[in-house]
Protein backbone atom coordinates (compact mmCIF):
# COMPACT_ATOMS: atom_id res chain seq x y z
CA UNK A 1 0.00 0.00 0.00
CA UNK A 2 1.41 3.34 -1.06
CA UNK A 3 1.40 6.18 1.46
CA UNK A 4 -0.36 9.36 0.33
CA UNK A 5 1.86 12.33 -0.40
CA UNK A 6 1.84 14.61 2.64
CA UNK A 7 3.74 17.85 2.67
CA UNK A 8 6.31 18.23 5.44
CA UNK A 9 5.00 21.73 6.11
CA UNK A 10 1.56 20.30 6.97
CA UNK A 11 3.12 17.86 9.45
CA UNK A 12 5.11 20.68 11.04
CA UNK A 13 2.13 23.02 11.25
CA UNK A 14 -0.07 20.34 12.80
CA UNK A 15 2.48 19.35 15.44
CA UNK A 16 3.34 22.98 16.16
CA UNK A 17 -0.33 23.77 16.79
CA UNK A 18 -0.87 20.70 18.98
CA UNK A 19 2.36 21.33 20.90
CA UNK A 20 1.41 24.96 21.51
CA UNK A 21 -1.94 23.88 22.91
CA UNK A 22 -0.30 21.09 24.91
CA UNK A 23 1.98 23.67 26.53
CA UNK A 24 -1.07 25.13 28.29
CA UNK A 25 -0.68 22.34 30.85
CA UNK A 26 2.76 20.82 30.18
CA UNK A 27 5.43 23.48 30.05
CA UNK A 28 9.17 23.39 30.59
CA UNK A 29 10.79 20.21 29.33
CA UNK A 30 7.75 19.22 27.24
CA UNK A 31 7.96 22.50 25.35
CA UNK A 32 11.75 22.35 24.95
CA UNK A 33 11.73 18.80 23.60
CA UNK A 34 8.92 19.34 21.11
CA UNK A 35 9.89 22.79 19.85
CA UNK A 36 13.51 21.68 19.37
CA UNK A 37 12.33 18.82 17.17
CA UNK A 38 10.05 21.18 15.27
CA UNK A 39 13.11 23.38 14.63
CA UNK A 40 14.79 20.33 13.08
CA UNK A 41 11.69 19.97 10.93
CA UNK A 42 12.07 23.57 9.74
CA UNK A 43 15.66 22.70 8.81
CA UNK A 44 14.35 19.71 6.83
CA UNK A 45 11.93 22.01 4.97
CA UNK A 46 14.66 24.57 4.25
CA UNK A 47 17.08 22.00 2.84
CA UNK A 48 14.94 19.85 0.60
CA UNK A 49 17.75 17.55 -0.56
CA UNK A 50 19.45 17.02 2.80
CA UNK A 51 19.31 13.49 4.13
CA UNK A 52 20.82 14.65 7.42
CA UNK A 53 18.04 17.14 8.10
CA UNK A 54 15.20 14.70 7.49
CA UNK A 55 16.93 11.89 9.38
CA UNK A 56 17.51 14.14 12.40
CA UNK A 57 13.85 15.17 12.31
CA UNK A 58 12.76 11.53 12.07
CA UNK A 59 15.00 10.52 14.97
CA UNK A 60 13.73 13.44 17.01
CA UNK A 61 10.11 12.51 16.37
CA UNK A 62 10.83 8.97 17.51
CA UNK A 63 12.53 10.28 20.65
CA UNK A 64 9.68 12.64 21.49
CA UNK A 65 7.19 9.77 21.35
CA UNK A 66 8.98 8.29 24.34
CA UNK A 67 9.52 11.68 26.00
CA UNK A 68 5.87 12.68 25.61
CA UNK A 69 4.75 9.46 27.27
CA UNK A 70 7.05 10.23 30.19
CA UNK A 71 5.95 13.89 30.42
CA UNK A 72 2.25 13.14 30.27
CA UNK A 73 2.45 10.27 32.76
CA UNK A 74 4.56 12.17 35.30
CA UNK A 75 3.17 15.70 35.03
CA UNK A 76 -0.52 14.92 34.46
CA UNK A 77 -2.46 17.08 36.94
CA UNK A 78 -4.44 14.71 39.16
CA UNK A 79 -6.25 17.11 41.45
CA UNK A 80 -8.46 19.42 39.47
CA UNK A 81 -8.51 20.28 35.81
CA UNK A 82 -10.30 23.24 34.34
CA UNK A 83 -11.80 23.05 30.88
CA UNK A 84 -8.71 24.77 29.50
CA UNK A 85 -6.48 22.25 31.26
CA UNK A 86 -8.48 19.33 29.84
CA UNK A 87 -8.17 20.86 26.38
CA UNK A 88 -4.39 21.21 26.76
CA UNK A 89 -4.00 17.63 27.97
CA UNK A 90 -6.20 16.39 25.13
CA UNK A 91 -4.10 18.20 22.53
CA UNK A 92 -0.86 16.83 24.02
CA UNK A 93 -2.31 13.30 23.89
CA UNK A 94 -3.57 13.86 20.33
CA UNK A 95 -0.09 15.04 19.32
CA UNK A 96 1.37 11.90 20.87
CA UNK A 97 -1.11 9.69 19.01
CA UNK A 98 -0.37 11.36 15.66
CA UNK A 99 3.43 11.14 15.98
CA UNK A 100 3.75 7.49 14.83
CA UNK A 101 1.75 8.35 11.70
CA UNK A 102 3.95 11.40 11.15
CA UNK A 103 7.02 9.17 11.55
CA UNK A 104 5.73 6.93 8.76
CA UNK A 105 5.29 9.92 6.44
CA UNK A 106 8.67 11.41 7.36
CA UNK A 107 10.36 8.03 6.86
CA UNK A 108 8.80 7.86 3.40
CA UNK A 109 10.25 11.33 2.67
CA UNK A 110 13.61 10.14 4.01
CA UNK A 111 13.58 7.26 1.53
CA UNK A 112 12.59 9.62 -1.31
CA UNK A 113 15.58 11.84 -0.53
CA UNK A 114 17.92 8.90 -0.94
CA UNK A 115 18.16 7.56 2.58
CA UNK A 116 18.78 3.88 3.08
CA UNK A 117 16.69 1.40 4.98
CA UNK A 118 17.26 1.93 8.70
CA UNK A 119 16.48 -1.66 9.71
CA UNK A 120 19.26 -4.04 8.72
CA UNK A 121 18.54 -7.76 8.79
CA UNK A 122 22.01 -8.89 7.75
CA UNK A 123 22.05 -12.00 9.89
CA UNK A 124 18.73 -13.17 8.44
CA UNK A 125 19.29 -12.23 4.82
CA UNK A 126 21.98 -13.05 2.33
CA UNK A 127 25.57 -12.32 3.21
CA UNK A 128 27.43 -9.37 1.74
CA UNK A 129 29.86 -9.76 -1.13
CA UNK A 130 33.30 -10.09 0.41
CA UNK A 131 35.23 -11.21 -2.66
CA UNK A 132 37.81 -8.44 -2.21
CA UNK A 133 38.95 -9.87 1.13
CA UNK A 134 41.36 -12.73 1.59
CA UNK A 135 40.01 -15.64 3.58
CA UNK A 136 41.73 -16.87 6.72
CA UNK A 137 42.13 -20.38 5.32
CA UNK A 138 44.14 -19.13 2.35
CA UNK A 139 46.84 -21.47 1.08
CA UNK A 140 49.04 -18.54 0.10
CA UNK A 141 51.60 -17.90 2.80
CA UNK A 142 54.08 -15.05 2.64
CA UNK A 143 57.51 -16.13 1.43
CA UNK A 144 59.44 -14.49 4.27
CA UNK A 145 57.34 -13.14 7.16
CA UNK A 146 60.34 -11.16 8.50
CA UNK A 147 61.26 -9.53 5.20
CA UNK A 148 62.18 -5.85 5.28
CA UNK A 149 60.03 -3.59 3.09
CA UNK A 150 61.76 -2.05 0.11
CA UNK A 151 63.52 1.26 0.73
CA UNK A 152 64.11 0.61 4.44
CA UNK A 153 67.25 -0.73 5.98
CA UNK A 154 67.51 -3.11 8.92
CA UNK A 155 68.48 -0.37 11.38
CA UNK A 156 65.41 1.82 10.68
CA UNK A 157 62.91 0.83 13.33
CA UNK A 158 59.40 2.21 13.67
CA UNK A 159 59.52 2.73 17.42
Curated annotation (Swiss-Prot):
Query: Among its keywords, does the record have Endoplasmic reticulum?
Result: yes
Q: In which tissues is it expressed?
A: Ubiquitous but more abundant in kidney, heart, pancreas and thyroid.
Renumbered residue ranges of the record's region Interaction with AGTR1:
110-122
| Gene Ontology, cellular component aspect | cell cortex; cytoplasmic vesicle membrane; endoplasmic reticulum membrane; Golgi apparatus; Golgi membrane; intracellular membrane-bounded organelle; plasma membrane
Transmembrane region positions? Answer: 24-44, 56-76, 87-107
Q: Which UniProt keywords apply?
A: Cytoplasmic vesicle, Endoplasmic reticulum, Golgi apparatus, Membrane, Phosphoprotein, Transmembrane, Transmembrane helix
Tell me one GO biological process term: regulation of blood pressure
- What is the recorded membrane topology of this protein? Multi-pass membrane protein
According to the UniProt entry, its GO molecular function terms are: angiotensin type II receptor activity; identical protein binding
> Residue ranges, Extracellular compartment?
1-23, 77-86
* Modification Phosphothreonine occurs at: 135
What is its subcellular localisation? Endoplasmic reticulum membrane; Golgi apparatus membrane; Cytoplasmic vesicle membrane
Where are the Phosphoserine residues found in this chain? 126-127, 138, 153
> What are the boundaries of the region Disordered?
140-159
> What superkingdom does the record give?
Eukaryota
Under SMART domains, the record lists: AGTRAP
**Residue ranges, Cytoplasmic compartment?**
45-55, 108-159
Purpose of the protein: Appears to be a negative regulator of type-1 angiotensin II receptor-mediated signaling by regulating receptor internalization as well as mechanism of receptor desensitization such as phosphorylation. Also induces a decrease in cell proliferation and angiotensin II-stimulated transcriptional activity.
Subunit (UniProt): Interacts with RACK1, and with the C-terminal region of AGTR1.
Protein name according to UniProt: Type-1 angiotensin II receptor-associated protein
Q: Recall the taxonomic lineage recorded for the source organism.
A: Eukaryota, Metazoa, Chordata, Craniata, Vertebrata
Amino acid sequence: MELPAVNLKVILLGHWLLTTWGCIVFSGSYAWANFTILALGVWAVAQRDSIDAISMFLGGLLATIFLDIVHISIFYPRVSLTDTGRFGVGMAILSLLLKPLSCCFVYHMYRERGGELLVHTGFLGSSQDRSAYQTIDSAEAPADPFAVPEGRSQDARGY
